[in-house]
């Protein structure tokens, strides 16, 4: 074996080793705020790269969508199967102000509702709120046994399904088109489902009636004042208020 330099071993790397910078050192933390229609306002934190040159951090945050459990927003475990989508519309300081962007059910809840020996009835309605939000609401309902029923199955006839679907459409249209988006988000979880169940009892008894999904199709032109009012931060009501103070006339002592 020839004795000599092993080029592979002696060959060193050119230049010094680059320092690896922690990517999180270039990021800032912002708080995500839910609208005042929910009981809990603090959703969580989000990270974004700091403003450098022409790239503004606020522009990167606007439009971000967060999916939050309604149970966390309302401090109520009964709503754990509902997921609310919130979209960042404005950034004020270190706070991201969000607005309602949609609602959905968890897949495990939807699977648990579907059972044998009953009829599943679905309907979807496109509605416009009074503040010009275009929404599509998806309703779901299941038939149930009548009192003192002996038969195992609870299948509804096609004519009954059509009548129930028509009733669902009418109720959703009436409730949604006469309210703002903020008012509608309060009704969606429970109120509309109970109203449908009560109204369709004469056609066929229903159970597990829910608005399972809400899809935001179109938003009106962005209005900062409306968003601040939604978050309870509007200062329009405080302007121009008369301040009541007692006026005491100063009497100068005669010299």
Curated annotation (Swiss-Prot):
InterPro entries: Ribosomal_eS1, Ribosomal_eS1_CS, Ribosomal_eS1_euk. One of its GO terms (biological process) is translation. PROSITE patterns: RIBOSOMAL_S3AE. Its main location: cytoplasm. Residues 19-28 have a biased composition (Basic and acidic residues). The modification N-acetylalanine is found at residue 2. Keywords: Acetylation, Cytoplasm, Ribonucleoprotein, Ribosomal protein. One of its GO terms (molecular function) is structural constituent of ribosome. SMART domains: Ribosomal_S3Ae. HAMAP family: Ribosomal_eS1_euk. Belongs to the eukaryotic ribosomal protein eS1 family. This is Small ribosomal subunit protein eS1. The gene is RPS1.
